Amino acid sequence: MTNFTRREILAAFLGAPIALAACRRNTAPPFPEGEIVGTSDVFGHRLRDGLRVEVPSDAWTNVPIVIVGGGIAGLTAAWHLQKSGFHDFVLIELENAPGGTSRSGSNRVVSYPWGAHYIPAPMKENVALVSLLDEMGVLEGKDAEGEPVVGEQFLCRDPEERIFYKGRWYEGLYLHPGATEEDKRQLDKFNAELGKWITWRDARGRRAFTLPVSTCSDDAEVTALDRISIKEWMDQRGLNSPRLVWWVDYACRDDYGMTVDQTSAWAGLFYFCSRVAKPGVESQSLITWPEGNGRIVNHLFEKGKDRVQLDRAAVELIPKERGVEVVTVDREGRNPRGLRAQRVIFAAPQFMARYVVRPYRDNPPAHVGEFQFGSWMVANLTLRDRPKLSPRDFPLAWDNVLYESPSLGYVVATHQRGRDHGPTVLTYYYPLCDENPRIARTRLLEAGWREWAEVALTDLERAHPDIRSLVERFDVMRWGHAMIRPRTGFMWGTARREGAKPFRSIHFAHSELSGVALFEEAFDVGLRVAEEVRLSLV
């Protein structure tokens, strides 16, 4: 985007009114130091374009199980295999660090997330996740009803959320100040509708919406919600309050990288209902760390790091009469090696399978094209001090949102440390919600470090006029395939079901197969597929 003016760049990502106001203020750089970090887009494009290598005959190794992909699903599969007493496997990860969109970073100030940054406290029914958190030392036993008790230091501390609107910060994410009686009536009606679905059970006693998705009801009354968007569902009920629509839209952009017009009504209701135990109670408390879900990544990685090969890519999976040949190279596409596996757990997205699984290259299954991914820009801003706060403002929270901004705002990495003064790191999230995911990826990648720094700083400057003087470093990560998009018709269409079926000796395990890109889903599919593969070898 080097040929565009500052105003044109700001208008493209923040809208014309913000761009015009910013240019009138004439608060252009100086810029802080920083860079674009992270994912190997160049190597991924080489795979897409048909990278081919030959493995020398003396560079082959036999191993029962190969796991392709070191995100949460792949790491969970490795964790489960080891807990089950199975240690003869190899995990291949292209990047120099595991975790996928749950990875994290650190500097002299604090550790910080590069993507996913919390999980809701699990309910007792999620036995495996409760077991993991107990192993991590996060839990302190059970309450009288058998629900896990999370240690206070791991729960998101107050204040949790605030929203910026017309020059002031307010508590919470729904904009209560200035709400009309009609706004309030519609909010109450929306919550009543949610209560009905939270209470709902099918003939087998299953909830309509719960975590993980694999335990949700597939009753026709529930799956019918996937045929319309959440905006259409709201319109049918007269729920058109601008504040309410914005709040639901924010939720969809936050969890799915999609707008209310794009998001399936099933997915929209899932967001609000799956984390609530019963009507009238708060959503499950949030578990978080300074580095977000990177804490879980580090725990899982440490459990099996001697079986993980980082900076190594699986470039071809060749199904044989018995087993699979896995061709791997380093990040430069050199040093080819081969693994002869009895089973492969493909813990990478379906769009990669069409380039890596040899039979898919010439004749990819129809379902592969149904998996669409959203693009995100995540930036970490290292500040020498906190932005100034007006006495009338609600104080700095963990999650800080700008009303009517296309961004999601930022989380504060030092919040869990209990430090409310001095240096900090703000993690800023910007989902690209274009209707066409390819256009979104093009916009993401065409904007360089300077453009993204200008977008984020201009956006934040509305709430923090002193932000530019406080930023010491501004680093960017561009996620071209950040998360699956649960668009209308996808959740209960055929693609997820077909994508989950093994192809000969290749078993698929990625959060996309649940339709929503949440930690619980990646954990669940990694667990289930690892057990499926383990039992197949017994």
Language model: regions and residue ranges:
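Extreme N-terminal leader/targeting segments of oxidoreductases
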Residues: 2-64, 83
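Conserved flavin/dinucleotide-binding core of flavoenzymes
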Residues: 25-54, 166, 172-178, 323, ...
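Glycine-rich Rossmann-fold phosphate-binding loop(s) that bind the pyrophosphate
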Residues: 69-71
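N-terminal Rossmann-fold NAD(P) dinucleotide-binding loop
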Residues: 74
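Glycine-rich FAD pyrophosphate-binding loop
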Residues: 82-105
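Dinucleotide-binding Rossmann-like beta1-alpha1 core, especially the glycine-rich loop
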Residues: 109-197
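Active-site/ligand-binding neighborhood in enzyme catalytic cores
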Residues: 202-323
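Mid-domain catalytic core of redox enzymes
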Residues: 310-425, 463
